[in-house]
Amino acid sequence: MTIRILCDFDGTVTEHDNIIALMTEFAPPEAFEPLKKGVLDQSLSIQSGVGQMFRLLPSDRKQDYIDFLEQRAVIRPGFKTLLAFAKSNGIDFAIVSGGIDFFVQPILQELLTDEAIYCNGSDFSGETIRIEWPHTCDAACNNQCGCCKTSIARKLKQDGDIIVTIGDSVTDFELAKQADHVYARDYLITLCEQHGIAYTPFETFYDIVDHLQTTEVYA
């Protein structure tokens, strides 16, 4: 049996959502805001919404985007402690993110290998950014997730494994419905309460480490 922690990135590992920050800074608000609303109220699939958002951004400003996000990204307190706790206790840890490789990987490069990061890809060869989807939905999911967290969980899970998810928003909801234990903050708490999904609230990763150390969450 392996305990597998599948952790969101934007708004979870980082204190703010990097896609929202990037779009707010660089995208035309009259085009971005309806897409944001559609994704959040689930009238627009994540894959469609995120794909359309990035088509609003010119490819030739790639370094500006990277510099902007690296300068403002704040890692939520306790993340290194959680990684160390997972390593010392034989817990498998992976990032499952609806974010994009060109900013997720640089922000995490000193903390995790790329092999432990599941996220969307990017193509800057055209006039605007085209998002690539290496982790699309499997046959068991038809939600057009983009980076399908439930499909990744099914791919990784072996018989007897325990899936723990950590997240903050609508992109974490489908996995929260299937995980053995959920750590939630912000909008994911609202969704869990609306649908009767058990969860443990957190604000920092120290909260999660404390809970893992003191509670039999895997029973």
UniProtKB/Swiss-Prot annotation:
Pathway: Amino-acid biosynthesis; L-methionine biosynthesis via salvage pathway; L-methionine from S-methyl-5-thio-alpha-D-ribose 1-phosphate: step 4/6. Keywords: Amino-acid biosynthesis, Hydrolase, Methionine biosynthesis. GO terms for cellular component: cytoplasm. It comes from the Bacteria. Its EC number is 3.1.3.87. It catalyses: 2-hydroxy-5-methylsulfanyl-3-oxopent-1-enyl phosphate + H2O = 1,2-dihydroxy-5-(methylsulfanyl)pent-1-en-3-one + phosphate. CDD domains: HAD_Pase. One of its GO terms (molecular function) is L-phosphoserine phosphatase activity. GO terms for biological process: L-methionine salvage from methylthioadenosine; L-serine biosynthetic process. It is an enzyme of class 3 (hydrolase). Belongs to the HAD-like hydrolase superfamily. MtnX family. PANTHER family: PHOSPHOSERINE PHOSPHATASE, POLYOL PHOSPHATE PHOSPHATASE PYP1. Dephosphorylates 2-hydroxy-3-keto-5-methylthiopentenyl-1-phosphate (HK-MTPenyl-1-P) yielding 1,2-dihydroxy-3-keto-5-methylthiopentene (DHK-MTPene). This is 2-hydroxy-3-keto-5-methylthiopentenyl-1-phosphate phosphatase. It comes from Exiguobacterium sibiricum (strain DSM 17290 / CCUG 55495 / CIP 109462 / JCM 13490 / 255-15).
